[in-house]
């Protein structure tokens, strides 16, 4: 009996120690597209989050506690995003890095706000997200209201086209950016011949290409993602159309070159700066390459910065309450791989720079002149 009692007591102690160890893990939901047409953007996000968590834990974690990433796939689909958000609530996770697409982030954010969960999005750029008075929603990405004017300024001052078409994919991200560019161009009395939408996932753009030729369009701005832009470029060049194309960071992806081939050469794209070329980030670049991950994608770094920001607030406050972390970040900012970040009361960054780049057929890019 005594031996059995000792065994039971030892088992109870081991179980208690096990539960204590489990309690020391700080779970962080990482949500993005593992599937769907823009899963490659999700790859950037997950790679950035994984590397950030790995690096933070290697330095001792949060006061000795480890960050644990729990990954979810929303496919950049609004309905799936809502299901994922509810799953995160049921899983008892207090912090979310994600979502990536504006169209999936906004409905998910309603749930996080209601449940008091902190969400830091590294990719949702639509301004509406943070204009609803929510207290638990932040982002490390710049806004369409900044990226759009950057594109418009370059179009007006450098390209100086005569006849412009603006096209979008009818989604929150793409249409929002297209309207922002249109506003900038119209304010300067530029000749925007037409503004029209296509359907995301569409592959046959023969009617659109014919319209561009008929209207003598010499410049196209497309608000959307790389699958459609790649098809547009390939089909336009196949019929001899030499119109200049431009898009946002959603088109700046190596997969675009796989779709468009040589037709990708010379496309213009607005993107964040190349954080992988910052000497201060060389150690992270080397670690990513050693793990056979591409360090060049912007969302690798913007997501890494989102995780860093969360970790900074957890370490600095010693609190696990989401609202306390939000208040700390808004008051004190965070130093990250993309530079020092400071947020306004809405949860938007006070400054985020976009540049204009020229895309090349091999999937690389260089600063546009």
Swiss-Prot record:
One of its GO terms (biological process) is branched-chain amino acid transport. Coiled coil: none annotated. One of its GO terms (cellular component) is outer membrane-bounded periplasmic space. It holds the Pfam family Peripla_BP_6. It comes from Escherichia coli (strain K12). NCBIfam families: PRK15404.1. Gene3D superfamilies: 3.40.50.2300. Belongs to the leucine-binding protein family. It comes from the Bacteria. GO terms for molecular function: L-leucine binding. It is found in: Periplasm. This is Leucine-specific-binding protein. The gene is livK. SUPFAM superfamilies: Periplasmic binding protein-like I. Disulfide bonds join 76-101. This protein is a component of the leucine-specific transport system, which is one of the two periplasmic binding protein-dependent transport systems of the high-affinity transport of the branched-chain amino acids in E.coli. Residues 1-23 form the signal peptide. Keywords: Amino-acid transport, Disulfide bond, Periplasm, Signal, Transport. CDD domains: PBP1_ABC_LIVBP-like.
